[in-house]
Amino acid sequence: MENHSKQTEAPHPGTYMPAGYPPPYPPAAFQGPSDHAAYPIPQAGYQGPPGPYPGPQPGYPVPPGGYAGGGPSGFPVQNQPAYNHPGGPGGTPWMPAPPPPLNCPPGLEYLAQIDQLLVHQQIELLEVLTGFETNNKYEIKNSLGQRVYFAVEDTDCCTRNCCGASRPFTLRILDNLGREVMTLERPLRCSSCCFPCCLQEIEIQAPPGVPVGYVTQTWHPCLPKFTLQNEKKQDVLKVVGPCVVCSCCSDIDFELKSLDEESVVGKISKQWSGFVREAFTDADNFGIQFPLDLDVKMKAVMLGACFLIDFMFFERTGNEEQRSGAWQ
């Protein structure tokens, strides 16, 4: 009878339970409906289900890949994949875009916060080896070495090689997104001081198709002179160069002056690049300095004046043994 009573007290009828059973918790621990077998509540002192496998003890080999080591799951990734920005370690970093000021043409906001530009012409290997004139390319940087713009000449092959440095050209200036923010248009003009009625000129457009200023050559028997004009062709500033536009081992300065030529407010410098580069290539370096508070449109016009000066006095074409002088 005693054995029979123990069997009737077991959780499942007909199951023989040894001495010490039933367990200390009551039968009400079973959860869920009566026809569904559920797990009972664990006894006191139960440590819970086993977690991830612990790490290997000292002296054991490192587990293979895929081994779920100890510690919490979903541990954050420490090294995120890097985005290969066009101006990353493989190239020149771009200047961050500043907030555009009021009444600023799109793309010229970069010029609002700087008072100096560096213009570096790229060396074309085909041009060096064969003398075949290619489209000029320029990097335009700020004083920190960050690229502000990239300029590309857009002139057909026949015009480049037949007209040489006197050629008409279109220069497209791009920002860090590859958008054309400025266009420089130089028409075909006479390059001799003997014809003052047809002197050099370049038009600056920002955005393309909208003129913001002009650079016109002013006739003078000895000095290279230019006038910087606004979009209404009103004179704003002047650029005056040296009598002889050539030197060795030193820079050549074109001073930015007021209209009365009494005060100097900036300059365009053709920088000495070294004997090898000067002798065997036409890749030039220029520095442009202007007042920080100068209107961004006039800063863009000064950039156009730099390119016009480069083509007039420092552009080597074909197999010419020396570059252009002050007057041809």
Curated annotation (Swiss-Prot):
* Residues modified as Phosphotyrosine: Y83
Regions that span the bilayer: 298-314
- What are the site positions for Breakpoint for translocation to form MMTRA1A? E127, V128
Give the record's PTM text: Phosphorylation at Thr-170 by PKC/PKCD increases its phospholipid scramblase activity during both cell stimulation and apoptosis. Phosphorylated by OXSR1 in the presence of RELT.
**Any single GO CC term annotated in Swiss-Prot or TrEMBL for this entry:** cytosol
One biological process term from GO is:
positive regulation of intrinsic apoptotic signaling pathway in response to DNA damage
> What is the membrane topology noted in the UniProt record heading this document?
Single-pass type II membrane protein; Lipid-anchor
What positions does the record give for the motif labelled Nuclear localization signal? Answer: 269-275
* Extracellular side of membrane: 315-328
Residues forming the motif PPxY motif are 22-25
Per UniProt, subcellular location reads as: Cell membrane; Nucleus; Cytoplasm; Cytoplasm, Perinuclear region
Q: Which cofactor does it need?
A: Ca(2+); Mg(2+); Zn(2+)
Primary location group? membrane
Q: Which reaction does it catalyse?
A: a 1,2-diacyl-sn-glycero-3-phosphocholine(in) = a 1,2-diacyl-sn-glycero-3-phosphocholine(out); a 1,2-diacyl-sn-glycero-3-phosphoethanolamine(in) = a 1,2-diacyl-sn-glycero-3-phosphoethanolamine(out); a 1,2-diacyl-sn-glycero-3-phospho-L-serine(in) = a 1,2-diacyl-sn-glycero-3-phospho-L-serine(out)
UniProt function note: Catalyzes calcium-induced ATP-independent rapid bidirectional and non-specific distribution of phospholipids (lipid scrambling or lipid flip-flop) between the inner and outer leaflet of the plasma membrane resulting in collapse of the phospholipid asymmetry which leads to phosphatidylserine externalization on the cell surface. Mediates calcium-dependent phosphatidylserine externalization and apoptosis in neurons via its association with TRPC5.
Q: What is this protein called?
A: Phospholipid scramblase 1
Species, as recorded = Mus musculus
**Gene behind the chain:** Plscr1
